[in-house]
Each structure stands twice: as C-alpha cells, then as structure tokens.
Amino acid sequence: MSETYELKAETRDRVGKGSSRELRRNGLIPAVIYGDKQPPLSIALSTKDVTMKIHAGGFMTTVATIDVNGEKIRVLPKDYQLDPVRDFTMHVDFLRVSKGSQVSVQVPVHFENEEKSPGLKQGGALNIVRHEVELNVSADNIPESLTVDLTGLKIGDTVHISNVKLPAGATPVIADRDFTVATITGRTQEAEPTEEAEGGEEEA
C-alpha cells in the first residue's frame, strides 16, 4: 500500500463555473468529497500540492487525509480532470472512506523478468491486454500495482487474472470469467518484397 499523505483544504460556499475559474486564478483547485452516506462537501485545494501528488504517481490508489478547516477526512481520489490544452488539474473528486471500507480501484499492472521468458527471447512480443485491473479491495490494503512474472512463458502462452497474485481479500470487479491480462505473441513476419521491387532487381 502507498504511504498516505495529508492535504489542507477549505470549504467552498459558492459553486459553478464562475466560482471555479476564480479559484483557479488564485492557485486553487475546486474539489468534492462524497460518499459514506454523507452529503457532498465542496472544497478548494492548493493547485501546487495536488499537482505534485499526481505527478509523484500512485495518486488514484493512495488513501489520503484532507484537513478541511481542522476536520480530518480520510479519502480516496476517484477522478480528476485535466485541461486538454494547458495540462493542469481542473477538478478532483474524492470518495470518503472509513476504516475497513471496501472500494473499487483501478490498479496498474507491472511486468517483470522479461529476460527470463523463452518466448520473448525467441523474438516474440508481449501483448498487454490490460494495463490496469479494477479490484474490490479494502481501503486499508490498496496495492500500488500488480506484478506479473513472465518467467518461463513461451510464444502462445496467456496470462489470466487467476495467474496474478492479488492482495489478501482483494477480488476482481469482473468476476464472471478468468479474463486475459497479457499474451506472448509470435514473431512478426517480415513483409514480402513487392512485385515492383522484384522487377527492379531483375532489370538491374
């Protein structure tokens, strides 16, 4: 599980596009805390602090504490919006979580020991079907990533979710099938020379 962190925030009395634009001009990001059978809470956070956490990695899989005017609230980031042109954070949604809460989280998949895969050594390719897997997991036990060991995999082999070690108590959101995470595909055949190219060689 990623190390938790704390952000300071203040409540927002006004909502809407005009209010949000004003916050951004002042170096703040509008955000909402929702869930846990409580009414949504509109807040504003430091743009600099949130951007640093997003760029540090693991933002969507790390439970954080938000200090809202002295009240400590445990949350899990559920979504954030980026400006498509200027690439800065425009808004964040946080899910309120309590001790032992079950949450659904998209967890990134990492692959290791590629050099120990006979299929890859023979020129095969790693075809990643799922870069992330959505898990139902305790908010206190969210993994930073899932690891797939490629040792011994040959061309034609498939990695299913059942082959991936999950944290204790975690289950895939997709529960009705043993879905594919990755495959080792065969070597790409070189394109055959065209008739035009062959004819050119004969003339030469």
From Swiss-Prot:
GO terms for molecular function: 5S rRNA binding; structural constituent of ribosome. Part of the 50S ribosomal subunit; part of the 5S rRNA/L5/L18/L25 subcomplex. Contacts the 5S rRNA. Binds to the 5S rRNA independently of L5 and L18. It comes from the Bacteria. Residues 1-20 are annotated as: Disordered. The gene is rplY. PANTHER family: RIBOSOMAL PROTEIN L25/GLN-TRNA SYNTHETASE, ANTI-CODON-BINDING DOMAIN-CONTAINING PROTEIN, RIBOSOMAL PROTEIN L25_GLN-TRNA SYNTHETASE, ANTI-CODON-BINDING DOMAIN-CONTAINING PROTEIN. GO terms for biological process: translation. GO terms for cellular component: cytosolic large ribosomal subunit. It comes from Rhizobium meliloti (strain 1021) (Ensifer meliloti). This is Large ribosomal subunit protein bL25.
